């Protein structure tokens, strides 16, 4: 049985041509016209990559600092001691600690969106890995969240760093702004994300790298993007 389309969704579908393939400039304008919620909806990009994540060398994972941020206020927790803890606090980290922070996590007190750790703290972080991992909060060198440079890491996250990774089917979903953003800022954020993903293309990947791409709002239908245009972004 096909899912019934609501009046709200039908009204949005009437505004755009969902069968069309959009260039990123047009899509950035058109997706803004689909804002209909009572909150500032998130703009999200979905990419289907021509990779097989079952192979370690094709597990695409990374991070990029969007030029205009995501529009979301991010709470950051940092595992660090001594001078590094002081640096994290000075940089604006919301929660900083070591054993005490691990204890808070064990007790279910997770009031943050990103976790950063200095390398010497990873043994401790590993003890709460079963809790952080499923929530996507485990620090990782590939996303710049395991580092001795906590000042830079905190600044990047607060400035709009987006962490991404392919799922089992080769898909990447990432926020690239808010519906209230200017269309040009949405476009520039999308291109910055795609440029990073292009740089991470595995040498062993076969065929077309970006198989399908789409942009949407939290509560809107998606618009198909020109995958070739995105693959050409450098």
Curated annotation (Swiss-Prot):
Statement: the UniProt record of this protein carries the keyword Ribosomal protein: yes
Record-linked InterPro entries: Ribosom_uL1_bac-type (IPR005878), Ribosomal_uL1 (IPR002143), Ribosomal_uL1-like (IPR023674), Ribosomal_uL1/biogenesis (IPR028364), Ribosomal_uL1_3-a/b-sand (IPR016095), Ribosomal_uL1_CS (IPR023673)
GO biological process, one term: translation
PROSITE patterns attached to this UniProt entry: RIBOSOMAL_L1
GO CC term (a single one): cytosolic large ribosomal subunit
Origin: domain of life: Bacteria
GO MF term set: rRNA binding; structural constituent of ribosome; tRNA binding
Alphabetical keyword list: Repressor, Ribonucleoprotein, Ribosomal protein, RNA-binding, rRNA-binding, Translation regulation, tRNA-binding
Family: Belongs to the universal ribosomal protein uL1 family.
NCBIfam families in UniProt: rplA_bact (TIGR01169)
Reported function: Binds directly to 23S rRNA. The L1 stalk is quite mobile in the ribosome, and is involved in E site tRNA release. Protein L1 is also a translational repressor protein, it controls the translation of the L11 operon by binding to its mRNA.
Subunit structure: Part of the 50S ribosomal subunit.
Record-given protein name: Large ribosomal subunit protein uL1
